[in-house]
Amino acid sequence: MKTLLLTLVVVTIVCLDLGYTLKCNKLVPLFYKTCPAGKNLCYKMYMVAMPKVPVKRGCIDVCPKSSLLVKYVCCNTDRCN
């Protein structure tokens, strides 16, 4: 009986994902990293002249403003960048 109860508790914790954190792609989208506390956005940075080639990806707390040369795209779901 104790084993069954322990199993139910473990399954509940795994299913609820109590320690939810955001996952963002690294520069190569096959790899991702778990964002630290406070960094609740994923971002992708690329040069305006080459919009299909991202320069940097990762976690960030506030989305930076784009400029004439660099564009930032931010989102808040897992691996959205």
Swiss-Prot record:
Pfam families: Toxin_cobra-type (PF21947). Disulfide bonds join C24-C42, C35-C59, C63-C74, C75-C80. Keywords: Cardiotoxin, Cytolysis, Disulfide bond, Membrane, Secreted, Signal, Target cell membrane, Target membrane, Toxin. Its main location: secreted. One of its GO terms (biological process) is killing of cells of another organism. SUPFAM superfamilies: Snake toxin-like. One of its GO terms (cellular component) is membrane. InterPro entries: Cytotoxin_Cobra, Snake_3FTx, Snake_toxin-like_sf, Snake_toxin_con_site, Toxin_cobra-type. One of its GO terms (molecular function) is toxin activity. PROSITE patterns: SNAKE_TOXIN. The keyword Acyltransferase does not apply. Expressed by the venom gland. Residues 1-21 form the signal peptide. It is found in: Secreted; Target cell membrane. Belongs to the three-finger toxin family. Short-chain subfamily. Type IA cytotoxin sub-subfamily. Shows cytolytic activity on many different cells by forming pore in lipid membranes. In vivo, increases heart rate or kills the animal by cardiac arrest. In addition, it binds to heparin with high affinity, interacts with Kv channel-interacting protein 1 (KCNIP1) in a calcium-independent manner, and binds to integrin alpha-V/beta-3 (ITGAV/ITGB3) with moderate affinity. Monomer in solution; Homodimer and oligomer in the presence of negatively charged lipids forming a pore with a size ranging between 20 and 30 Angstroms. This is Cytotoxin 4b. It comes from Naja sputatrix (Malayan spitting cobra).
